[in-house]
A protein has these predicted regions:
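Auxiliary alpha/beta "docking" domains used to position bulky ligands
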Residues: 58-59, 164-167, 193
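Conserved Radical SAM active-site core
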Residues: 1-88, 95, 100-106, 111, ...
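Conserved C-terminal portion of the radical SAM core fold
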Residues: 97-163, 181-198
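A C-terminal junction/extension of Radical SAM enzymes
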Residues: 174-240
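Surface-exposed cleft-lining segments at the edges of enzyme active sites
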Residues: 84-92, 120-130, 164-171
């Protein structure tokens, strides 16, 4: 089983105490977002979890105690650092601070376990194609020695994104081509393996690799382990990732990113964050009368 700690929320930045407690106690409960009365229990032990993957925009809160997880589990880290400022990502540290934190993370876990996510790419009057490429080049130069690869995607124009960011300029085919070509050239210059995420077109002619973000070969090489050959079913349409289980909850991230796919309502997310109990086995709330707890299937890929 591959355990995902951060697809639904930034668990690392805002729920570090809870996350560490879950690993210390050896289990976690996850409420089904589609069927709220159904809760799944997962055992957090090395014999049940093949690899723990992290997704965050700020690893600083967990760095001093990250060894409590990495000493016991195979791991892989996705670190999102974009070109945007607080006008788009109000709760995210500056680019400079993020680069420094990634370097520290790399020193702890090794560059082979870190993927830099530069996504989603979106355009506004401020964040133009040239702005992205200039910023990406500066970041790539600084990050190249500390990462395994870089993953990018173009923004998905969900209805809530259109509502929250009316200033977004729709990406044309020409824009995407210019961005992909530019990213490919920069990646080649600094020796960075660059790949797409999801259904973002074919840009192999620019040195961009089409792949899933969470592939068994990526996790295996990073941790020097061999996984069985498995079909990667993906987590959604167009996704090429290996199936994994997320232990977070939607509408719980206070970052306030305007393009956020996971939050429907920032006010609700802030309220949920305020009411969070680090001692609960659930990230959000408690087991309620009428809830059904089932043991999750934790089949090994090894």
């Amino acid at each position: 089983m591959i355990l995902n700690t951060g697809a639904r929320t930034d668990t690392v930045q805002y729920y570090t105490e809870w996350l560490l407690r879950r690993f210390a106690e050896g289990y976690v409960l996850s409420r089904n977002p589609l069927f709220p009365n159904k809760i799944t229990r997962y055992e957090l032990t090395p014999d049940k979890v093949d690899c723990v993957i992290f997704c965050s925009k700020n690893y600083a809160p967990i760095l001093p105690r990250l060894h409590k997880i990495t000493d016991r589990f195979h791991t892989y880290f996705y670190y999102t650092i974009t070109a945007y400022g607080r006008d788009v990502e109000p709760g995210v540290p500056s680019i400079e601070d993020s680069i420094q934190t990634l370097r520290k993370l790399s020193e702890i876990v090794g560059r082979q376990r870190i993927a830099w996510r530069y996504d989603p790419i979106l355009l506004t009057e401020k964040y133009t194609v040239s702005y992205h490429l200039e910023t990406f080049a500066r970041m790539a130069k600084a990050l190249a020695p500390y990462i395994d690869r870089c993953i990018f995607s173009f923004v998905e124009m969900y209805k809530k994104v259109e509502v929250n960011m009316p200033e977004i300029i729709l990406l044309s085919k020409t824009d995407k081509k210019a961005l992909a070509q530019g990213l490919g050239l920069i990646g080649d210059k600094y020796g960075i393996y660059i790949q797409t995420c999801g259904t973002n077109g074919d840009y192999t002619r620019y040195g961009i690799h089409p792949s899933g973000c969470t592939m068994l070969d990526i996790l295996g090489r990073a941790n020097d382990i061999v996984f069985k050959t498995r079909k990667h079913k993906g987590m959604r349409q167009g996704c090429h990732c290996i199936e994994n289980r997320d232990i977070g909850a939607y509408d719980t991230c206070p970052n306030g990113c305007k393009y956020c796919y996971a939050n429907k309502n920032l006010c609700k997310a802030m309220e949920n964050f305020k009411n969070h109990d680090p001692a609960s086995p659930l990230l959000l709330g408690y087991v309620r009368p009428g809830d059904t707890i089932v043991q999750g299937v934790q089949k090994s890929f090894r």
